[in-house]
Amino acid sequence: MSSSSPSGSGSDLTERRGIPAAKFIQDVETYLSQSGLDPNSALAFHQERLQQYKVVEMKLLAQQRDLQAKIPDIEKCLEVVATLEAKKGTGEALLADFEVSEGIYSRACIEDTDSVCLWLGANVMLEYSCEEASALLKNNLENAKASLEVLVADLQFLRDQVTVTQVTIARVYNWDVHQRRVKQVTPTAIAVADS
């Protein structure tokens, strides 16, 4: 999103996490004269900016989907660790069905255990004590929820910028159509007055 702003004063624009804010154009004629653009160039600039916003929105939505899928997995892991901690010391074995492959399950009998293995990603698994695993999973859950809140706020900011940009495009287009009609009417009015 590093294209230059034709508004003439880039200091008015703020941004949120690298997403530039769209500036509402109050007076199209003043905007065009200050930026030195003709209506077609201004429309092209704002349509390009709109496309950039759409690309960023798709990336943020993908991140949001990933986080929304990750949070239930972390919660499920926390429940399993809590169950293992609760069964520890009782002397009874825990029967668990786990998925080996898609649609293929196996049954395991888990005796008293002091540790669990967690997938950390990138084909890395580490063994943790139940307490450490629980603390790590709680921390990961808090981080994922905080990241999701930030993403939701970023998406709302982005949607606001898309709306402002769409309104700006409509205003510039309508102003251009109005100016063309005025130019067409003026020669016709002069021709009628001359005859």
UniProtKB/Swiss-Prot annotation:
CDD domains: Prefoldin_3 (cd23156). Induction: Accumulates in response to cold. The keyword Cytoplasm applies. One of its GO terms (biological process) is cold acclimation. Its main location: cytoplasm. GO terms for cellular component: cytoplasm; nucleus; prefoldin complex. Disruption phenotype: Reduced levels of alpha- and beta-tubulin. Altered development patterns and disturbed microtubules (MTs) organization. Hypersensitivity to high NaCl salt levels. Increased capacity to tolerate freezing temperatures upon acclimation (e.g. 7 days at 4 degrees Celsius) associated with a continuous accumulation of HY5 in cold conditions. Residues 134-161 form a coiled coil. Keywords: Acetylation, Chaperone, Coiled coil, Cytoplasm, Nucleus. Pfam families: Prefoldin. Signal peptide: none annotated. The modification N-acetylserine is found at S2. It is found in: Cytoplasm; Nucleus. Binds specifically to cytosolic chaperonin (c-CPN) and transfers target proteins to it. Binds to nascent polypeptide chain and promotes folding in an environment in which there are many competing pathways for nonnative proteins. Together with other chaperonins, contribute to the regulation of gene expression by modulating the spliceosome function on pre-mRNA splicing post-transcriptionally by acting as a co-chaperone of Hsp90 to control levels of LSM8. Required for the biogenesis of tubulins and for subsequent microtubules (MTs) organization and dynamicity. PANTHER family: PREFOLDIN SUBUNIT 3 (PTHR12409:SF0). Belongs to the prefoldin subunit alpha family. Heterohexamer of two PFD-alpha type and four PFD-beta type subunits forming prefoldin co-chaperone complex. Interacts with PFD6. Binds to the DELLA protein GAI. Interacts with LSM8, a specific subunit of the LSM2-8 complex, which is a core component of the spliceosome. This is Prefoldin subunit 3. It comes from Arabidopsis thaliana. The gene is PFD3.
